[in-house]
Curated annotation (Swiss-Prot):
<dbReference type="GO" id="GO:0003700">
    <property type="term" value="F:DNA-binding transcription factor activity"/>
</dbReference>
<dbReference type="GO" id="GO:0010089">
    <property type="term" value="P:xylem development"/>
</dbReference>
<comment type="function">
    <text>Transcription activator that binds to the secondary wall NAC binding element (SNBE), 5'-(T/A)NN(C/T)(T/C/G)TNNNNNNNA(A/C)GN(A/C/T)(A/T)-3', and to the tracheary elements (TE) specific regulating cis-element (TERE), 5'-CTTNAAAGCNA-3', in the promoter of target genes (e.g. genes involved in secondary wall biosynthesis, cell wall modification such as xylan accumulation, and programmed cell death).</text>
</comment>
<dbReference type="GO" id="GO:0005634">
    <property type="term" value="C:nucleus"/>
</dbReference>
<dbReference type="GO" id="GO:0048759">
    <property type="term" value="P:xylem vessel member cell differentiation"/>
</dbReference>
<protein>
    <recommendedName>
        <fullName>NAC domain-containing protein 101</fullName>
    </recommendedName>
</protein>
<dbReference type="Pfam" id="PF02365">
    <property type="entry name" value="NAM"/>
</dbReference>
<dbReference type="GO" id="GO:0042803">
    <property type="term" value="F:protein homodimerization activity"/>
</dbReference>
<keyword id="KW-0961">Cell wall biogenesis/degradation</keyword>
<dbReference type="GO" id="GO:0009733">
    <property type="term" value="P:response to auxin"/>
</dbReference>
<dbReference type="GO" id="GO:0009737">
    <property type="term" value="P:response to abscisic acid"/>
</dbReference>
<dbReference type="GO" id="GO:0045893">
    <property type="term" value="P:positive regulation of DNA-templated transcription"/>
</dbReference>
<dbReference type="GO" id="GO:0006355">
    <property type="term" value="P:regulation of DNA-templated transcription"/>
</dbReference>
<dbReference type="GO" id="GO:0000976">
    <property type="term" value="F:transcription cis-regulatory region binding"/>
</dbReference>
<dbReference type="InterPro" id="IPR003441">
    <property type="entry name" value="NAC-dom"/>
</dbReference>
<dbReference type="GO" id="GO:0009620">
    <property type="term" value="P:response to fungus"/>
</dbReference>
<keyword id="KW-0539">Nucleus</keyword>
Length: 348
């Protein structure tokens, strides 16, 4: 036992629950006069927990746990309760006792206690915790309120967050970005739809229910127009009351009337302001193409069904527009000039 008085550097005294009970405590009870330098005898109920480090420290560097023997006494001579009061507070048991086994045989029990500053029943909970080990052979038997116990005292670890670690901050931002894929909310008379983007969340603003329905009801669109923000160029698409498509690309202003007869289609305004909502030219091409095709279909419905030449012209024009739109969608990007020339040719 004396050889353990000085622990060489690099070694730490960190016994298991089984070793504390089955070896150290059992020998202490069998030989009360035996002294173990690594575990000192301390009257726990006459000192404060913050004094344990000085009394039980082993001087081997930084320590987080302190071990000591203590003799339990009854609070009242004729009672059964253990006296766990100190000068400035008290130790309060918490939870259920844990059984300690050695080779599948019960050798002791472990009780967990928390130190409270002040007097019972009112006290301020501290971060000092103690495990009190006692010899026990019957798990369901009454606890022994007197005799030697071995204790491990330590301070509760505080959970901290590393704000410099990007992984700890990724959860909240990822959760917020995921909402852009599914979130939809109504603001006033207009609807705002949040669409996915590879680089950053971008918002499409529709100011009327007609334009929104034509964009999102793909089953009613014969060409299945799908909004996409891949390779998006910073632009803004909004509603225009007079039924015009207006695009502002740096120094160029392009305007096209999409109204046919008494029926006005939804217009779009494209602004190169990076702070506004954005969409790409490819999406604009698809949208305008679908609007032109749908307007021509409605014209043919209102015309005389006997006019076969008009029907043939319409179908021929629709096929040409579909081929043009497919070829334009196959390209990686569309410039404002190509979009303007294509829109004029298809509308005339």
């Amino acid at each position: 036992m004396e050889s353990l008085a000085h622990i060489p550097p690099g070694y730490r005294f960190h016994p298991t629950d089984e070793e504390l009970v089955d070896y150290y405590l059992k020998n202490k009870v069998a030989f009360p006069g035996m002294q173990v330098d690594v575990i000192k005898d301390v009257d726990l109920y006459k000192i404060e927990p913050w004094d344990i480090q000085e009394l039980c420290g082993r001087g081997t560097g930084e320590e987080r746990e302190w071990y000591f023997f203590s003799h339990k006494d009854k609070k009242y001579p004729t009672g059964t309760r253990t006296n766990r009061a100190t000068g400035s507070g008290f130790w309060k048991a918490t939870g259920r006792d844990k059984a300690i086994y050695s080779k599948q045989e019960l050798v002791g029990m472990r009780k967990t206690l928390v130190f409270y500053k002040g007097r019972a029943p009112n006290g301020q909970k501290s971060d000092w915790i103690m495990h009190e080990y006692r010899l026990e052979t019957d798990e369901n038997g009454p606890p022994h309120e007197e005799g030697w116990v071995v204790c491990r005292a330590f301070k509760k670890k505080l959970t901290t967050m590393n704000y410099n670690n990007p992984r700890t901050m990724m959860g909240s931002s990822s959760g917020q970005e995921s909402n852009w894929f599914t979130q939809q909310m109504d603001v006033g008379n207009g609807n705002y739809y949040h669409l996915p983007d590879l680089e950053s969340p971008r918002m499409f603003q529709g100011s009327s229910s007609s334009s929104l329905s034509s964009l999102h009801q793909n089953d009613q669109d014969p060409y299945g127009v799908v909004l996409s923000t891949i390779n998006a160029t910073p632009t803004t698409i909004m509603q225009r009351d007079d039924g015009h498509v207006i695009t502002n690309d740096d120094d160029h202003m392009i305007m096209m009337n999409t109204s046919t007869g008494d029926h006005h289609q939804s217009g779009l305004l494209v602004n190169d302001d990076h702070n506004d909502q954005v969409m790409d030219w490819q999406t604009l091409d698809k949208f305008v193409a679908s609007q032109l095709i749908m307007s021509q279909e409605e014209e043919e419905v209102n015309k005389d069904p006997s006019d076969n030449s008009s029907n043939e012209t319409f179908h021929h024009l629709s096929e040409e527009q579909a081929a043009t739109m497919v070829s334009m969608n196959a390209s990686s990007s569309s410039s404002p000039c190509s979009f303007y020339s294509w829109a004029q040719n298809t509308h005339t």
